[in-house]
Curated annotation (Swiss-Prot):
Entries under SMART domains matching the protein: CRAL_TRIO_N, SEC14
Compartment list: Mitochondrion
Sequence ranges assigned to domain PRELI/MSF1 in this UniProt record: 3-175
Gene: retm
GOLD domain: residues covered: 522-641
Protein name: Protein real-time
GO cellular component, one term: mitochondrion
Domain CRAL-TRIO: 284-460
Amino acid sequence: MVQKFQSPVRVYKYPFELVMKAYERRFPKCPQMPIVLDCDVIKIESLENGAKTNTTRRCKLAVDAPYIFKKLIGVDFVYFLQHNYLDMSNRTLSIEAVNESFSSRIEIFERCRYYAHPDNAEWTCFDQTATLDIKNFFGFEHSMEKMGMKQYTQTTLKGKEIIEYFINQLEQEGVTHVDRWVPPLDAAKSPTPEQKQHHDILLDGDFIARNLGQLSPMQESKLLELRKMLDGVDDLERVPSYQTILRFLSARDWHVSQAFAMLCDSLQWRKEHRMDSLLEEYTEPAVVVEHFPGGWHHHDKDGRPIYILRLGHMDVKGLLKSLGMEGLLRLALHICEEGIQKINESAERLDKPVLNWSLLVDLEGLSMRHLWRPGIKALLYIIETVERNYPETMGRVLVVRAPRVFPIAWTIVSAFIDEHTRSKFLFYGPDCEHMKDGLAQYIDEEIVPDFLGGPCKTMIHEGGLVPKTLYKANSLEDHDDDVTIVSPGAGAATATASAEASLAPVALAPMKRLSANHQHDHQNLYKSVDLKPGFSHELLIRNEDPKSVLTWDFDVMRNDLHFTLYRVTQELPEKNDDAVSYFDLQDFVEGTNYFREEPTLICRHKESVQGSHVMHHNDSYLMHWFSPSGAQLNLFYEVLSSVNYKGSMTSLQSAFSSNSSAASSVQSR
């Protein structure tokens, strides 16, 4: 099997002529490359008045292999033939090397190129490819492949170091400039027409240091490669900035083709939705001005603009019903556009690279009411849209005052956030200002917000409930009962899903929806339960995972009912008849073999109730609904594994209590 190797393009920030002067010092051998024992020039020819020089060398290389392997093959060194084709007029050097030893058993071919940087004549590029084809090598084919890969990696890494070493050596000797080759005065002019220079992208070191930060040579080259690919897009109105190109490359782990596809999709999206005009055309609706708890607040220690979002004070349901999905998305996109603008302003003001902004999320007041189903779906849709079109604009996310319900919210939402973005989240408990490695590590103490105990007042609204008078006439309020239902024992009966349909804004219809494996489609999740007067509905959950979390969400569709959560210590039988209650069992006594874990909650008609409970014990848990006058509810529950609360969630476990958050969620019903 042929093994192929491709190095990234490396950039020397020195002229081609100086790099060639340094390259010559590698021969016949140098201590920086001990594997090369010697090189003999066996042929050299000069062409076109010295403009071109072709050199063939026979190089003796040490076998970098275990002693026993060298004894088996019977050699301590091997020979390679190297052919150099130097063209000083066009400022290129092509190198081809093939193995002379064992050529009938192994074929090794390496091609390297040095050439003047196409966009900066004072720089030199280098790239390298190689193939390894082992036909038959005494039964050691696999070992040879591994050694070949290792050797290629080592020589690739050392190559640039050696050139840099000899350039520094030349500088110490006073050689910092080598004149370009010019033809002799009496030389006949070449009939070859002068090549038209069409490279107009100038990217110098000062620009990179000032605007993009420290990039590796490979990253610089890929940046230019993607920039050139964009030049070939016919219907592109304007080429994005280098900062934007850099963000998309970083988001796709520096895979140029993937970044190109992602960026082209985003540019088309921006064109379709007039995103370049959003900052000029957008006017904040009154409900945002009066009830949205978010805004910009100074800069962090790295110069990033800070956006504060007091999520725990946000009425998610009220904002969504007032703005609609399109309005909420436009608000989020406007914040992103403002962020880009403030990033550029900060970079210009500080005269240093600033490529993203920071988000400070205050979760005080967060409860299960924030996990309202349409609100979660809207949030996931916004996350997907932002990640597709504003990658790598978020530098750091500081999550403060995280309550006990936060791990549940994080479990749901984090799966939809890019892994690299998730790594930027930092979580803090209540004492986020004074704890070790607290906010002061990232934000100057004088600008810590007053609601966190700092001295700086913010201009951010407190949030609070949105008055229903601001709800849209066709908001989700009119469709609270339109949910997808599965009737127990009767198969799936699908009700109208107008609440779901209303989340697809017409103006943003061309946007790609959530991928199939990431959709939070609530179809078939909820069961419809009819409670006859004086009867109860019970669900028994046998817990074998201590510290797992039981979550529930139900809508009261007709009349009032009572809800209680119990913990049961005795083994209970399976129940086949809904008319029979576990509480009818003999010797089933509260405080002896069952315990009330959550106080009884009276749930009113048309209320939506969400709650959670950490199941600390390896017992059974009994969810109990009772209605004196008969009722109907649409019910969903889920058990979240304890593994969801390890790692970054560990510090939050101490904030858990046995009380349900359902009481606080009732406020938003």
